[in-house]
Structure formats: C-alpha cells, structure tokens
Regions:
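Extracytoplasmic
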Residues: 20-53, 58, 71, 235-240
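Helix-breaking motifs and short loop linkers at transmembrane-helix boundaries and internal kinks
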Residues: 50, 82, 103-109, 120, ...
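Conserved MFS/SLC helix-loop-helix module at the cytosolic interface between two early adjacent transmembrane helices
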Residues: 69-108
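Helix-to-loop junctions at the C-terminal end of transmembrane segments
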Residues: 71-83, 268-280, 368
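Paired small-residue
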Residues: 93-100, 108-117, 306-314
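Cytoplasmic helix-loop-helix junction between adjacent transmembrane helices
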Residues: 107, 113-151
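C-terminal membrane-cytosol helix-exit motif in multi-pass small-molecule transporters
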Residues: 180-199, 391-394
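A late C-terminal transmembrane helix in Major Facilitator Superfamily
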Residues: 333-371
Length: 404
C-alpha cells in the first residue's frame, strides 16, 4: 500500500504565490522587450517605412515619454480599481498596442501603437511590484519583487537580441507579432494564477504628487535620474546603426553584440545594487563619473572594432548600474521629507527614468541628423556630466544634513 504526504496549507500557498509571480515575470518580460525592441530594429523600420533613422528613433523616445506620463498620471487615475482587474486591462492594452505595431503600414500608425503600449508599461511598472509584494508574506516581499523584475532582466539579455534577430530574418513586424504572443501568454497566466482578492490601491491625488516635486531635494534626484540614466540613451538608441555604419559590423553580428550588451547590463545592475547598499549617493557619483568618461572615450574608439566593442560593453556595464542606487536614494529621501508618499516618490522616479530615455533618444536624433552618429557619444557624456555635478551637489547637501 503506497503512502503519500498531503501538502500543507502553507506549502500550497507558497506554490500559488510562486506561480503568480511567474505570471508577473512573464508580463515584465514582454513589457521589457517591447520597450527597447526598436533599438535593434531602427535600420529595418527606417528602410521599410521610408523615414530617416533619426525619425525612426522616435519609436524609442515617444514610447519612453508615454511611459513617463503613464506611470504617475494613469496610476493616480486607476488607483481605486481592483488590482487584478487593472492588471488584466494593462495586458489587453499592451496586446492591442503591439498588435497595431505588427500591422502598421505607416510610421504614424506605428508611433500611435508605441504610445498605446507605453501607457500599459507605465502603469504596470507602478502596480507590478505592489501586486508581487501583496501575494507573499511580509518577510518575503523583497524577494517577490526581485522575481517579478527578473522578467525585465531576462528581456534585456535575451528579448531584445532575439527580437532583433526575428526582425532581421522575417521583418520588423514579426518582432512585434512575437511580443503579441508573449502578451497573450501573460494575459492567460495572469487570469489563472494571480489571485482576485488583492486589496485595491490607495488613491493618490495629483496634489500629493505635486508636493513631492516641490521638495527641492527630491526634485534634484529626479533630475539626476533623468540626466544620468538618460545620457546613455543618446548613444544606445542609435547603437545598431552606429555599430553597422561607424564600427563596420554586419547586422547579424549586431544581434550577438546586443546579447552581450544585455548581459553586461544585468551584471552592472547586480553590482550597482551591492555598491549602493551603504552610501548610495556616493556610489552614484562614481558610477556617473566613470560612465561619462566611457562615453567620451567611445567618440574615439567607435570606428575601431575591438576598441569600440570593449568601450560599448563597458558602457552597458554602467548603463543600468545606477538604477538600484537611484531608487534606494529616492526612498531614503522620501522617508525623511515626505514619509506619507514613499510609493508615489518611487513611481515619479520611474517616470524620471523614462523621461531620461525620451530626452536622451530625442537629443540623439538631433545629433545624428546634424553632426552624425559618432557624435552621440560625447553629447551623451555631457548629459551624464550634468548628473555628476548635481550628484556632487546632493552629496554636499547630505553631509550638511548629517552635521545638523
């Protein structure tokens, strides 16, 4: 006679939570892939829709702008909705946006599709971590959020280069169709695996958001986020044409380089988290300082394959290294100055990240049009120098607070 052990209630709950987190991670993977997929597809989109590479770059900058608006504004407007209902609507909008992109026959329609997708991105980034934290015990919340964000990391490493490969082999529309499939899988997974008894969000007024922006110390960090994170995107947005037209790599090789670049980003993100645990603002100063130097050096190494590749991978290593430190420092300042709106401060900083992407990619387009692709590197470096100066100022203010 065989025997078996009935799983405990706690074990069943843990299993359900893990499957729900997996569903959120799949959603994050799709959203992370669609955010940067255009970077690898710019040459294809430019050629097929008869627009310049600079104009094609608007698929990155306007997407980021849409996400920047979507994070604080749409999150505030939907705060009273059921979390699962909102999650399902986010995925519907995500699928529709990428579906329109997959059949777009004009650049205008493609831009509209990207903005629609971006709205879903902005809201998901704001509520995804909240849902992840709500479905696990309090002592496992950080791990749950990390699992959800694994989807973004995997998207950076594999989603973008694979999407670029699909676009090169079958056309750029096929890449967006693949993202639609991911969105449908995520929708089904969320509907089945994410519990329905989640608490509604706490309504956040625009007045509360304005209070945060009025706080000088927090506003300073939001600007640092936009400049320091966004500076790299002056170059990164046009990395594919830069690698092909300036460095001289074949399109197939660019896909592999994007994969290695994604791995460098993931490593840098983990390193940045550890470096920022003790003194985030000091760590950020050195991160931005080194990234600015790398961007300036790229101006001279980009025409050479070996030197250019080493510089570009170094750029990837530092590109997202600042993200954990910036988020942690915003939370520290919000807890100190506006303790009732810590979550809102984090959401606004997410908007600042996307605002930086929008600004950086837009400036990159202007530079590419007027000066040429290679000049995006030093211009991006100047943008990061702005973050270095403001970070030094913030360090001075921090020391003054400690003296008090």
């Amino acid at each position: 006679m065989s025997s078996y052990t009935v799983p405990s209630s706690e074990a069943q709950t843990n299993r359900r939570s893990m499957f729900a987190l997996l569903a959120l991670a799949i959603s994050a993977f799709g959203i992370g892939t669609t955010e940067f997929i255009s970077v690898g597809l710019l040459p294809s989109i430019s050629k097929d829709l008869n627009v310049s590479v600079t104009t094609a770059g608007l698929t990155v900058s306007l997407y980021a702008l849409g996400a920047a608006v979507g994070a604080p504004v749409l999150t505030a407007l939907t705060a009273s909705m059921s979390r699962k209902t909102l999650l399902m609507w986010i995925m519907v909008i995500f699928i529709i946006g990428n579906g329109i992109a997959a059949v777009a026959t004009s650049f205008t329609v493609l831009i509209i599709a990207r903005i629609v997708s971006a709205f879903a991105h902005g809201v998901f980034m704001s509520i995804g971590s909240t849902i992840a934290a709500a479905i696990v015990p309090e002592n496992k919340r950080a791990s749950a959020i990390a699992i959800m964000f694994t989807g973004l990391t995997v998207a950076t490493i594999t989603g973008v280069p694979i999407g670029t490969f699909i676009g090169q082999e079958f056309g750029w529309r096929a890449s967006f169709m693949a993202i639609v499939v991911i969105g449908i899988i995520a929708f089904i997974a969320n509907s089945i695996l994410v519990p329905s008894n989640l608490k509604n969000g706490v309504p956040v007024s625009f007045r509360d958001q304005f209070k945060l922006i009025k706080n000088g110390r927090l506003l300073l960090v939001f600007i640092i986020t936009a400049l320091g994170y966004g500076g790299t995107f002056v170059t990164f947005t046009y990395l594919s044409p830069l690698l092909q037209e300036v460095t001289g790599f074949e399109a197939s090789t660019v896909t592999i380089i994007l994969l290695v670049y994604g791995i460098a980003i993931a490593i840098g993100n983990m390193v940045g988290g550890k470096l920022s645990n003790h003194n985030p603002i000091r760590a950020l100063f050195y991160m931005f300082f080194i990234q600015a130097i790398i961007l300036f050096v790229l101006t001279f190494t980009a025409p050479f394959k070996v030197a250019g590749l080493i510089t570009i991978i170094s750029m990837g290593l530092f590109a997202f290294m600042n993200v954990p430190g910036l988020q942690v420092y915003v939370v520290i300042l919000a807890e100190r100055f506006v303790p009732s709106a810590v979550d809102v401060a984090s959401a606004i900083n997410i908007a600042a990240f996307n605002g930086g992407i929008a600004l950086g990619s837009y400036i990159g387009g202007l530079v590419t049009n007027s000066l040429g692709l290679i000049h995006t590197a030093w211009v991006g470096g100047l943008m990061v120098v702005g973050a270095v100066i403001l970070t030094a100022w913030s360090m001075t203010l921090e020391k003054r607070d400690q003296v008090k």
